[in-house]
Amino acid sequence: MKLSNFWIRTLTGILFLVIMVFGIIWDRAIFTCLFGIILTVALGEFYKMALGTRFRFQQRLGVMTGIAAFLLVAAYCFFGWDLRWLVIALIPLLLIPVSCLFLPSREGFGDLAYIYAGLLYIALPISLSPLLMMDGDVYDGWFLLSLFIMIWCSDVGAYCIGTAFGQKPNSRKLAPSISPKKSWWGFWGGLFFCVGAAIGLHYLTWLPFPLLHCIVLGLIVGAGGVCGDLFESIWKRHFGVKDSGNCIPGHGGMLDRFDSSLVAIPLAFVYLALIDLI
């Protein structure tokens, strides 16, 4: 019997949720493998959207740079490697311009900038994630999981409130030229759910910060998640695609699932670093 798209989307979503929770909290090696795969697939999707089959060798060098940077940051955080090992990630990065000297044609040469754009947009935020995973010498994935829970709650709130109130003819759209279905109702609903999740996680002690900072964190993560979602929508409109890929049945590509976190989690990291809480 053929499953409907609703059930495919639901079952895939549950499986995705289980893998994410298990991969984040269980063990540092499992986390490293999981997020290494996420980075590789998401970056590959971005390069495929932007460049197609052009500059394939340079695309591979870009993916190698991203995964090397992530693995070396993880090795520094989890296993005490010297941070100077990060220079290894410079090898494939520097090979990108060198390899361009041997291109048979310079047509579309400016599009090579997408290689570096993908590293800044995808590889850099994911490479920051191991820095949030240690409590002294003890591996602790609950904080990063809490940030993802806040993002997921924001998505649920935006969908529920936006569907209930934001699709009426007179409702104001958030960014109609980028994502016509998103409304201000959905934005405020997502923000409310995100802050509510942050407060709940604070009382569960998963967010070990003063309540005021948890509320601010909820606002930052909620707003940052919307920015990440809209930013990916701009890319997809620019490249003329509906989804970044199809590796997650019913949900599109890997980049579609992590677009919010690519902005929200780095913003949370910067905020907590500035107030000296991490």
Residue ranges of each PLM-predicted region?
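Hydrophobic alpha-helical membrane context
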Residues: V21, F57, Q167, V241-S244, ...
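Membrane-embedded alpha-helical bundles of polytopic integral membrane proteins
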Residues: M1-I220
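Acidic (Asp/Glu-rich) catalytic motifs at the cytosolic membrane interface
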Residues: L39-A50, I151-F165, W188, A223-V263
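Juxtamembrane boundary at the C-terminal end of a transmembrane helix
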Residues: V270-I278
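Hydrophobic transmembrane alpha-helices of multi-pass small-molecule transporters
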Residues: F70, C194-V195, R257-S260, A264-I265, ...
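Residue-level signal for alpha-helical context at structural boundaries
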Residues: A29, M64-T65, P249, G253, ...
